[in-house]
Structure formats: C-alpha cells, structure tokens
C-alpha cells in the first residue's frame, strides 16, 4: 500500500513504439569447418539517425537476454599547433630554447641578437 502523501507517477515507456525494431537471430558460417554461429545484423538509415554513423565506435555490453549498444563520441582531433607542441616537447633542451626564442622573435617580445 502506498503512503498517504505519495503521488503515483504514470509509467511512460522510455522508447516510443515507433523506435522499436524487431530482429531475428540468424547464423553466420565459420570457416574452415563451416559451423553455424549466431549472428545479428543491424542496418538501415535509422542507425545514423540514432547516432551510429558509419565509422562510429560502438561499446557493447552483454547481459543474460540483453545486449546494449552505445555509440562512443568521436575523439576531438588535436589541432596542428598541439601536434607541433608535442613534437617540440620531445626535442633536446637546447632545441626547445631555440623554438622559444623563435616564438619570442615572431611575436615581437624578443629582439634578434
């Protein structure tokens, strides 16, 4: 029995029926013995609309009777400047000072010797 001060919330489905898909587990043949292994194939424009564009990394969680697919966000590409900075960090201390002096000269904060 519920508490006298509680209000029952209507239960709404997390996914609308229009977004439900029905699939059947089929099989794929495995070489060299051609044994049949279970297979599920997903394809359709709805995948991209759901955030699964071609090339998207997908995290797969498997539980008894349940498979959860989660699209992984694309890693932000590092800017060309940051890539160059990483290269400079691998140089010797003398070459790093030369790069710093060069930056000082082109920004006008340091005089040419």
UniProtKB/Swiss-Prot annotation:
Organism, by scientific name, is Shigella flexneri
Q: S-adenosyl-L-methionine: present as a keyword of the record?
A: no
**Which EC class is this protein assigned?**
hydrolase
Q: What is the primary gene name for this protein?
A: symE
Listed under GO cellular component are: cytoplasm
Enzyme Commission code: 3.1.-.-
Provide the protein name. Answer: Endoribonuclease SymE
Task: Tell me the domain of life.
Answer: Bacteria
Its family remark reads: Belongs to the SymE family.
